[in-house]
């Protein structure tokens, strides 16, 4: 029987449940391939609305299912090389987690017993739009946490909102060091489960100093926003320490992000005297630049140091310029597929190729790594909580300063009060193997995280300008 009090509450709530259906309609429009996932989230969305209006929802709901919001580029220039592989890696790892198919130590079903639902949504549109999206996912859908974010600009925009809304957020990919060095110096809810851009620049400088010590200089072409600026700054400062004989140009090229056309910049690079060219281009910008540069013989005249070229390697195939120094922002993508022989990498690579018909790249690994970080933290917290579903504070405590195994590398949450990940790194030279029919890397050097990341408590610029004291490179 339903008493009068309950009837009154239901009469108040039911008209408002249109909020849920409207939100799901918008989600389905964002990515029609995700319809079945969106529809399965209806129960969770209703629970969030009921809770908002003061109707108690049993703990069993939370234990049975958790919802992770996963932002990535589904449209625009960031989608083909970054966003879609990130989405694919997310879908693969979550499906396997729910079925208990991930190799040890993640071979239990679900996350702390809960099946995982993912709301994968479009990161395109800029910072203001993404702040709105973030608020909507928390306040209207009641998601448990976020895992993802490709763009440094997006991370810079949503960091304060994540702390304001007290929502656990694991940055999987965005690279700017500013997140914890300037924007959120005492983070609670925000984590990053991989190294930041300083590691890329320092590892590359070590590689250049070792392999290209006789080069006459270096210049750069980088996107004119946080990621590009930080990438060039850190590489340039590291070169001043590790290879002061190789001089950097002050006349680098700074096109806006997603510019798409680089005729003037390519002309300037062809005229520049420096042997080496640094670029942190990614996504559609990287591929457009490569095609335009190939047409003008740019890669035959300069040696390119490409910190994110690993994302484009399999897409470009034979058209990937031979001889570029290729980065994948860690031991991900081509480095893991070719060089890391562990049960986890073998499983992930085989499952990804079987499902999507292509090799997993850097963002596929990084997004899966963030999801594994969530599984690790929730299950560690649940174990400490007597097997009960943990609170957000308990999950945070479990992840702070912890070490967990990603798909391709160990992740140590060892910087920024235990919120910034530290991982190993790799650099090598790319070419195309005709027999394999795949791009490969050779002359590879590996770098430990403590060699290429600032010690805890020291910001990147201070560390680099001070001669990188405390780096452990033995």
What are these regions (language model features)?
Residues 35-45:
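Bacterial N-terminal signal peptides that target proteins for export
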Residues 49-60:
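C-terminal segment of classical bacterial N-terminal signal peptides
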Residues 63-67, 81-85, 100-181, 193, ...:
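Beta-alpha junction/loop-to-helix N-cap segments that form part of ligand/metal-binding clefts
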Residues 66, 322, 402-474:
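Solvent-exposed, acidic/polar segments of extracytosolic/periplasmic ligand-binding ectodomains
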Residues 69-93, 121-127, 150-151, 221-229, ...:
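Extracytoplasmic "Venus flytrap"
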Residues 70, 137-150, 168-172, 218-222, ...:
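Periplasmic-binding protein-like
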Residues 129-132, 177-178, 186-296, 338-340, ...:
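Extracellular/periplasmic Venus flytrap/periplasmic-binding protein
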Residues 283-288, 336-402:
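Extracellular/periplasmic ligand-binding modules, especially the Venus flytrap/periplasmic-binding
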